[in-house]
């Protein structure tokens, strides 16, 4: 930003970073008030597209579920441990709690390290999830390039 960039998108790919990114953007805004500072998880930007491609009854890319397992099977298949002894883990929140942040460590949420449906993950789906995500991120970047930069308000002097 000190080199003159006027627009910034921090693209998050790990849910645990979300709050830190928001705080960082707020702090940067104080130092660079005339810069368009943005951040998002790829899964938020491509939520509709990912949901349309999912076969599992989840409503989002849960930790190591169908979406994440598929993406890793595409990008780094050597990191996916194929096993049949794990059962899918469906723990959706009741509708009344949707949108509520619940503070939990992953170890408190699951014993096996995943939520959702890793059994539904395939490399073929991973390619589709990746393409949909990249397409949406590019669309967002193109739109950000058309947006006006923030105006810095100067205090009135009387």
Write out the residue ranges for each language-model feature.
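Extended, histidine- and acidic-residue-enriched regions that form the cofactor-binding/catalytic faces
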Residues: 1-9, 15-158
């Amino acid at each position: 930003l000190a080199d003159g960039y006027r627009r910034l998108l921090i693209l998050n790919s790990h849910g645990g970073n979300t709050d830190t990114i928001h705080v960082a953007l707020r702090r940067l805004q104080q130092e660079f008030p005339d810069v368009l500072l943005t951040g998002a998880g790829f899964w938020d930007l491509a939520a509709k597209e990912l949901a349309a491609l999912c076969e599992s009854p989840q409503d989002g890319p849960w930790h190591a579920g169908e979406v994440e397992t598929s993406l890793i099977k595409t990008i780094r298949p050597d990191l996916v441990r194929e096993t049949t002894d794990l059962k899918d883990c469906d723990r959706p929140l009741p509708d009344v709690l949707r949108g509520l942040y619940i503070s939990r460590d992953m170890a408190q949420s699951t014993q096996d390290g995943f939520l959702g449906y890793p059994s539904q993950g395939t490399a073929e789906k991973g390619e589709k999830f990746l393409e949909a995500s990249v397409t949406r991120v590019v669309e967002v970047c193109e739109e950000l390039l058309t947006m006006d930069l923030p105006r810095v308000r100067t205090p009135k002097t009387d």
